[in-house]
Structures are given as C-alpha cells and as structure tokens.
Amino acid sequence: MMSKLGVLLTICLLLFPLFALPQDGDQPADRPAERMQDDLSSEQHPLFEKRIVDRCCNKGNGKRGCSRWCRDHSRCCGRR
C-alpha cells in the first residue's frame, strides 16, 4: 500500500510541479515599477503621438493652434 502511494505521489509531483504554478509575486499588478517602465506604453508609441498632434494642433477653432487641454497635456505644444 505504501509503495502505491509513493508511486502516486511521485507521478503527481512529476506531472504537476509546485514551482510551475504562478506565485503572487509573478503577477504584473504586484510590480508597478516594471509596469511604469514598460517600453510598449501608449505615451511612447508613435501612433499615439500622431493622434495627439492631429487632435490638438490641427483642430483649434479652424486655425492651427492648441486647445486648452493640449496646452496642459500634450507634447505638441511644448509641454512634456
């Protein structure tokens, strides 16, 4: 009986190793510093900058200029 339990335990440990299960520290929500330094962030993406520039600098009351939101938040008006 003990040898059957030993074989079963060995098989279970080989098929489902404990280190393969995700731990709490492996979750992205637990690592905010790494999320903030992500190279794929939307602020650094070239398409995001183009949308901001198009929305901010080209649509200001029919003339080329920056809206109030863009003056406060956008790179197109010189604020970083």
Swiss-Prot record:
Keyword field: Amidation, Cleavage on pair of basic residues, Disulfide bond, Ion channel impairing toxin, Neurotoxin, Secreted, Signal, Toxin, Voltage-gated sodium channel impairing toxin
Function: Mu-conotoxins block voltage-gated sodium channels. Extremely potent inhibitor of Nav1.4/SCN4A (96% inhibition at 1 uM). The inhibition is very slowly reversible.
Descriptive protein name: Mu-conotoxin BuIIIC
Signal peptide: 1-22
UniProt propeptide residues: 23-51
Keyword Metal-binding: no
Principal place of residence: secreted
InterPro entries: Conotoxin
Cellular component GO terms, alphabetical: extracellular region
Tissues of expression: Expressed by the venom duct.
Location(s) in or outside the cell: Secreted
Disulfide bond annotation, renumbered to this chain: 56-70, 57-76, 66-77
Modified residues (Cysteine amide): 77
Effect after changing residue 70 to A: In R2-Midi BuIIIC; potently and selectively inhibits Nav1.2/SCN2A
Recorded GO MF terms: ion channel inhibitor activity; sodium channel regulator activity; toxin activity
Additional record remark: The analog R2-Midi BuIIIC is a potent inhibitor of Nav1.2/SCN2A (IC(50)=34.1 nM). It also inhibits Nav1.3/SCN3A (10% inhibition at 75 nM), Nav1.4/SCN4A (45% inhibition at 75 nM), Nav1.6/SCN8A (45% inhibition at 75 nM), but does not inhibit Nav1.5/SCN5A and Nav1.8/SCN10A (75 nM tested). The inhibition is slowly reversible.
Domain remarks: The cysteine framework is III (CC-C-C-CC).
Similarity comment text for this entry: Belongs to the conotoxin M superfamily.
